[in-house]
Amino acid sequence: MELKELKKRLVEVFSKYVPQRIKDLEGCVRAAVLVPLFLKEGCLHVLLIKRAEDLLHHPGEIAFPGGIIEPSDQTPQEAALREAFEEVGLDPKRVELLGKLDEVLTTTNFIITPFVGVIPYPYPFKIDGKETKGLLILPLKEFKKEKATPVNFQGRTFLSYKIGEGLVWGATAKNPQRAR
């Protein structure tokens, strides 16, 4: 598959897709993430981060670049791009945003708006070291539903994917499945 073909297919999909929005809920905080997609060796890949262990929220988890929508962010997209720049050095001008996925409510009361974007690869990523401990570059096919296993957390069951030494689960596990 060529990058031009990938973009064309994704633009077509997103032109027909209406993402589900979650209304503002008391006690919830809005956040945004970037689901960065790229072609590597002709196969669609996704970039994930390993969050630092000393963070207040979701320490040590595997996630997409992203974070809380700050008052200075004019839009959720701006927040997702800002956070991706802060965490992995991804220049917002190098991200081609193609669409939005369904919003996700986490068990920690975040309402996450995920944005799908195509990025160049290879890319000189720069891990910030404060919020991000490492990068994971994975083929999107690793997130097939039949590869998922259930994990229980706070009385709820979530899909999860074993990735090397880590586990992708919760809100992060929902988004690659939707992006496929």
Predicted regions mapped to residue ranges:
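Acidic/polar loop patches that form or flank catalytic/metal-binding clefts of enzymes
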Residues: 125
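N-terminal leader/linker segments that precede catalytic domains of diphosphate-processing enzymes
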Residues: 1-63, 68-122, 149, 156, ...
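NUDIX/MutT-family hydrolases
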Residues: 128-164
